[in-house]
């Protein structure tokens, strides 16, 4: 995989998607000069002897405590070590790696006051696959993601653990083995590494990219379920959706039409079909999936801005680019409310994609609704067929309904009420990978059920696109002619979905 050259402040969503998938990262060399200017500005600001938050003062409620020049380096080290107070299971290394790339892009914009050596160490750690072990719990999404980013920063100091080559090693040992020296922090640098929304944003982007893959996959399984139930494609007619003018709905309807185009199964019941209208789970796919697509795109836009932004505090404006005056401005860019809202939107979309998919599975196993054998087995009674896979799908969907509760409506005061309103973005973003894992199971079960339903229509075949999907599944999972151990079938279908084999690139996506 080719390395991505990261242009701070100008990276499209596709860049973050490729980094999430494991692409290498190199910083645009032009960024180093901008970083150096920012660090020099911090030196000049300190020389003025003025109190500047986080540079020569305490933090949070202790911001009024002035720190002597001789203690400035100790101040930053103490900040990192004291804030590395996360708990819980380690975050997925792909998420931590993405977080590191986001932090690299933020620091490289020259508004954080760090030295080039600090940026270079972070860049080299990504390049050499030195990924800090970061506990998942401990951030409330303001002031930034302090605890998770502190664990990243601590690893740069040689404290904590680093995962590399499948091993967890003491951070100092891992750095030494890679030929890297632990960082000795300069003024402002500890705060610059800790302050920011990169943990929440990385988790939210990971959830978004997984949701995009599963959205596309669910369009395919939804079309296949429509075929299995001998549903109509009339509700997907372009004229219906043009009148409503909802962009996602228009695109979802077009995708369903194209997926079903040329189906012999559909042609077999164009006339003399007693059903005037299909159940909502078939008929309203464009409306539900289109709304989900629109919400995912809105979240993607928000996260795209956040990924390219600077969420540090205070921000350094170097005199070279600021009318000759060096300034350190305190603000609130660390507040992750935009990320929290985006994560909540993604959660709602993921929940609804699974909800309507489970309803299609339930319809397929019910002979009164689908016209297919009960529970999709040739000999119901002797065999239970898809009875319990549908229950599993229902369980996964119900779990996602609980997980979809908005995180952004919660807040709790911290730091002796100095930080009295927080976003809970980390909570909202962290749950997304659990939700998409649940959705993956639902989509996999629908793939199995829909393919099984189509088997009963032989020798009639579906469209060329959907027959390719069935053929791919049948390479790993034979048709269910009698009961067998079902878990391996679901696992095999999940592997197909996870590999993105249903997420055709010409289907609608977030960007």
UniProtKB/Swiss-Prot annotation:
It is an enzyme of class 4 (lyase). Pathway: Amino-acid degradation; L-histidine degradation into L-glutamate; N-formimidoyl-L-glutamate from L-histidine: step 1/3. It comes from the Bacteria. The keyword Lyase applies. Keywords: Cytoplasm, Histidine metabolism, Lyase. It catalyses: L-histidine = trans-urocanate + NH4(+). Its EC number is 4.3.1.3. One of its GO terms (biological process) is L-histidine catabolic process to glutamate and formate. Contains an active site 4-methylidene-imidazol-5-one (MIO), which is formed autocatalytically by cyclization and dehydration of residues Ala-Ser-Gly. The keyword Lyase applies. There is a cross-link at residues 142-144 (5-imidazolinone (Ala-Gly)). This is Histidine ammonia-lyase.
């Amino acid at each position: 995989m080719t390395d991505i050259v990261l242009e701070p402040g100008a990276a499209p969503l596709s860049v973050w998607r490729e980094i999430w998938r494991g692409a290498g990262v190199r910083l645009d060399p032009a960024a180093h000069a901008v970083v150096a200017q920012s660090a020099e500005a911090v030196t000049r600001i300190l020389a003025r002897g003025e109190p500047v938050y986080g540079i020569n003062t305490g933090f949070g409620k202790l911001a009024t405590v002035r720190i002597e020049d001789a203690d400035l380096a100790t101040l930053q080290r103490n900040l990192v070590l004291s804030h590395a107070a996360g708990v819980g299971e380690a975050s997925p290394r792909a998420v931590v790696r993405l977080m590191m790339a986001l932090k690299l892009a933020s620091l490289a914009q020259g508004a954080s006051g760090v030295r080039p050596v600090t940026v270079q160490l972070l860049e080299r750690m990504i390049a050499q696959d030195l990924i800090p072990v970061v506990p998942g719990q401990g951030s409330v999404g303001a002031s930034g993601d302090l605890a998770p980013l502190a664990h990243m920063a601590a690893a740069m100091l040689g404290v904590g653990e680093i995962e590399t080559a499948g091993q967890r090693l003491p951070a100092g040992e891992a750095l030494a083995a890679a030929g890297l020296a632990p960082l000795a922090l300069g003024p402002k640098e500890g705060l610059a590494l800790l302050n920011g929304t990169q943990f929440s944003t990385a988790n939210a982007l990971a959830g978004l990219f997984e949701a995009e893959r599963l959205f596309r996959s669910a369009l395919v399984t939804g079309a296949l379920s429509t075929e299995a139930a001998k549903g109509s494609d009339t509700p997907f007619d372009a004229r219906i959706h043009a009148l409503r003018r909802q962009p996602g709905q228009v695109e979802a309807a077009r995708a369903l039409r194209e997926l079903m185009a040329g189906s012999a199964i559909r042609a077999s019941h164009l006339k003399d079909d007693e059903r005037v209208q299909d159940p909502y789970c078939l008929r309203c796919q464009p409306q539900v999936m289109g709304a989900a697509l629109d919400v995912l795109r809105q979240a993607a836009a928000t996260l795209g801005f956040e990924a390219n932004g600077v969420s540090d505090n205070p921000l350094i404006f170097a005199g070279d680019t600021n009318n000759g005056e060096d300034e350190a401005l305190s603000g609130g860019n660390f507040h992750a409310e935009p990320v929290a809202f985006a994560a909540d939107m993604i959660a709602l979309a993921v929940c609804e994609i699974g909800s309507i998919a489970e309803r299609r599975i339930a319809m397929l196993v019910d002979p009164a609704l689908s016209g297919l054998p009960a529970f999709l087995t040739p000999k119901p009674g002797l065999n239970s067929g898809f009875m319990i896979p549908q229950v599993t799908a229902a369980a996964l969907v119900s779990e996602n309904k609980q997980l979809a509760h908005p995180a952004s409506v919660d807040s709790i005061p911290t730091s002796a009420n100095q930080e009295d309103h927080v976003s809970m973005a980390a909570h909202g973003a962290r749950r997304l990978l659990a939700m998409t894992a649940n959705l993956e199971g639902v989509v996999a079960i629908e793939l199995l059920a829909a393919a099984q339903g189509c088997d009963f229509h032989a020798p009639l075949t579906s469209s060329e696109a959907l027959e390719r999907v069935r053929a791919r599944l049948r390479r790993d999972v034979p048709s269910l002619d009698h009961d067998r151990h079902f878990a391996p079938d679901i696992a095999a279908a999940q592997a197909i979905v996870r590999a993105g084999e249903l997420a055709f690139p010409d289907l609608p996506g977030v960007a």
